[in-house]
Each structure stands twice: as structure tokens, then as C-alpha cells.
Amino acid sequence: ISKDNIPTIFHDYRLNPDLVKDASGNWITDKSMKLVELTYEEISKYTIGSVKPETKYAKRFKNQKPIKGEKIPKLTDFFKLVAEDKHKDVFLNLEIKSTLTQENVTPNPEKMVSLILKDIKEYDLENRTLITSYDWRILYELKKQNPNILRGFITLQQDLPTTKKNVYENSPWMVKKYPMEELFLLPNIIKSLEGHVWSVFYRDVTKQNVELAHKHGLATCVWTVNREKDIIRMIE
């Protein structure tokens, strides 16, 4: 969300010097620039779509094809596209980025949800949208403001190099406090919260919990499965 309350499509809370160029085409150097502290007009002066050479990103994604000169889009830019008749079969999985570990990088959940719902309603996409979040406060707020939009609960039960788990005993990410024994059966928790989708990290998937999710009528969305052997395991 920009300083002037415009939802954008961007993965991070800050502009990344390894991925972002300024209006002159130079790689930025300031690591502290938060989107929430920039107006959308200011954000639109930066370009993305390529990776700075010799960085960890460049080494990790050697085959990535750059799309130079791309701008950070407004959420409504995308909504305009999918609202066209030729894209009426497109269904949206919209993740709202919110965090408990960093201060002042987004508005509060109530405001974020309100701003995004306004755009969804404007383009009549309520029946074509699933909203997911790692921060379950967002999903609680969504249910309050519009219970008709599908809600997907993102879960991570192990720490990753770039992301810490959100499922653990008495986790604040989950809003309510759950004892350890209940966390082994996450679909039960999501069902009790009237969720629609369980969005689970692929290494946390078990056959027992997938079967339990299906029993509860929950769709299971697994992230992120790139290797063939993992794809086969997920299918099985």
C-alpha cells in the first residue's frame, strides 16, 4: 500500500537495490525505502523486471529473462485487465502481505483490507477472488468486512532462510493461541475459522492432513513445488 493509500502489486515492503532502478536507469542504493512511505507517483518512477548482475539473485536465477523498464503496477491496473470479457475465466489468488515482525511497513489490517475490498468491488471481482495471507489477522478482518470472499490460510511450520514459520504454539500470527497438539491437525483449525483454502508449504504436507482437509471441504493449495520429484509426491 502506498503512502496515498493505493494498493500495489509487489512482493516486498521495501524497494530492493538488487532489483530496482531509479528514473535515470541506475540501480538504487538505499535499502530503507518503504512503499508505505512513498506516494504512487513516486513509486512509479522506479523500474523493475531485471536483476543486478553479480548479486545473490543473479547467481540463483541465472536463466531468468529480464523484462526491462517494467513499473510496479497498481492493483487496479491488474483488475482492469482481468475484468475484460476475454479474461472472465480468470480466477484470482490474491495474497495480502502483512507482518508482525516489522513496524510501520504497511497500514493496519483493517485499513489494508478495506482499501483492497474497495478495488475488488469496483471491478466486480468478488466472486472471482480468493484472498490469502500469512498473517491471519488479515483473514479475520476480511471475514468481518466481507464474509462472502473466499479466505485462504497460509501456513509454514518450519523456518526457512528468508521466512520464519507462522505456525507454532501460541503464535501471534494465528491470532488465537493454540496448543501444540492442535497444530498437528491444521485443517481442523482452518475449518473452525470457516476458511475455504489451506495454503501449505510443500515440505509440511502430509497425506493425513490432505485427507483431513478434503474431508472438511477445504481446497489444498501447496507452495511452491518446482522439482519433479516433489510434484510427483504431491500428486500421490
Language model region names:
Residues I1-S2:
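Asp-based phosphoryl-transfer active-site loop
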Residues I6, H11-D159, W173-M174, P179-E182, ...:
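Metal-dependent phosphodiesterase/phospholipase catalytic core, i.e.
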Residues I154, P161-E236:
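C-terminal active-site rim and adjoining tail of enzyme catalytic domains
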